[in-house]
Design a protein with these regions (language model features):
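Conserved functional acidic sites
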Residues: 1-164
């Protein structure tokens, strides 16, 4: 309904779908945000701000979404602010390519509407996007979690992995 789009899905280590973002291909703005709630059901989140990808180093973009929390009757508010930190040259699968690093300040706020209590967790993440590949690396500020693209799976291989 809003032109061509692309859906990016996130999975847990055990292969369960946890989140999906539906991007407009022309603007790269988020059209829809889906999360899997505490009952294991797909739920459409409420989008307040829909931009996750800055286009230049002067731009700061904001994404904000609200959805059911993982505990009964709670709500989760997700807020992300992103800027391009720098550009770099790196090697991806033996190909030297241009890339840019994004810094993300994220806050996850768990809201209980009955007790009016809030629990907030802030974190800083870094994402590296390489020309011709997309997202190739991401890590947290303390480098406790660091992920790097090691293989691009074919559709058949991905399906086989999920159906084991």
């Amino acid at each position: 309904s809003e032109g061509k789009h692309i859906i990016v899905e996130r999975y847990s280590q055990d292969g369960r779908l946890t989140e999906a973002l539906n991007y407009n291909l022309d603007s790269l703005n988020v059209i829809d945000h889906m999360v899997v709630n505490g009952l294991g059901e797909n739920e459409k989140a409420t989008l307040y701000k829909n931009n996750l990808l800055p286009f230049n180093s002067e731009e700061e973009v904001t994404f904000a979404s609200k959805f059911s929390g993982f505990v009964d009757s709670t709500l989760m508010l997700l807020e992300k602010n992103r800027v391009i930190m720098d550009t770099l040259s790196l090697e991806v699968f033996s190909n030297k390519t241009e890339a840019f690093r994004i810094k993300e300040n994220a806050s996850y706020t768990l809201l209980n509407p009955f007790t009016e209590k809030e629990q907030r967790q802030d974190l800083t993440l870094y994402y590296i996007f390489a020309k011709g590949f997309g997202l190739v690396e991401w890590y947290d500020e303390a480098n406790k979690s660091h992920y790097k693209l090691e293989e691009i799976l074919s559709q058949d291989k991905w399906i086989k992995m999920l159906t084991r």
